Amino acid sequence: MTTSTIDIGGKTVNRLGYGAMRITGQGVWGPPKDHDEAIRVLRRAVELGVTFIDTADSYGPYVSEDLIREALHDGSGYGDVVIATKGGLTRSGPNVWPPLGRPEYLRQCILMSMRRLGVEQIDLWQLHRIDPNTPREETFGEIKTFLDEGLAKQFGLSEVTVEEIEAAKAAGLPIAAVQNMYNVGNRSAEDVVDYCDAHGITFIPWFPVNAGKLANPGGPLDEVAKQHDGATTSQLALAWLLRRSPVIAPIPGTSSVAHLEENMKAEELELSDDEFQTLADAA
């Protein structure tokens, strides 16, 4: 089995985590259609061994963080579970996500996330997007200030280039994690993955099971699945990511307990060298 742990937020966690975007309403706006199922999903994830959950203040907005606290906070914290969150986006409607990197807004983001999650320090706080309309030195400067104040144990970036990672490091920010879209079907962030691998930075791929045409009937994922006793294409997509690099920590999301249980079985899959390369080449 692929080595399944990684250090995030000062704790050793299982690499196959859970992304808590889909426990909100349609368009990642408002409450979930089934509140009780959302709570069940979160609790079942932990029962299945998930110790890394990723969310953001913009999911809902605020809904995902509130649900995580309701489902998992034990009165003093989250035990062995690392809760990562993000800030730096505003919401003006379903599927609308304008970035805002003003220092005062980012400080509000992290302070309000701390309040909603019921913690005195965020395990991993990530800048959801770099705002092109705010000077980077202002954004990075404020983040460094609240990191120095101890508001977060670790810091990460989302949807960034290698150049932007280097710029953040040059501004004095210790980069513990990078979260970009990346999956077996979309490898546009390959250079960022390689950079993270070389520098020991956790890489968190979002949309990890979105394999595109590779998952079509008769496609590469489908053909490999036939060699693994009915494994699903989603499970294979996750297994491929876990094999791709030891710094990768996928965060598949779902609002269904059944789908969650299916995804978690990906850790049991072991791709052969030929299978891994077949899928790598197919993209």
Region annotations inferred by a language model:
Residues 1-81:
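N-terminal binding-site loop/beta-alpha segment at the start of enzyme catalytic domains
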Residues 10, 70-82, 114-118, 147, ...:
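Acidic (Asp/Glu)-rich catalytic clusters
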Residues 11-16, 49-51, 77-81, 119-123, ...:
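Short, well-ordered coil/turn segments that N-cap beta-strands
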Residues 24-28, 90-96, 215, 259-262:
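A short acidic, helix-capping loop that chelates divalent metal ions and anchors anionic groups
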Residues 30-37, 63, 67, 97-108, ...:
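Alpha-helix N-cap and loop-to-helix initiation/capping positions
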Residues 31-45, 101-117, 161-166:
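Short, acidic/polar
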Residues 114-133:
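Active-site groove signature of glycoside hydrolases
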Residues 130-283:
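Beta/alpha (TIM)-barrel catalytic core signal, keyed to glycine-rich beta->alpha loops juxtaposed to Asp/Glu
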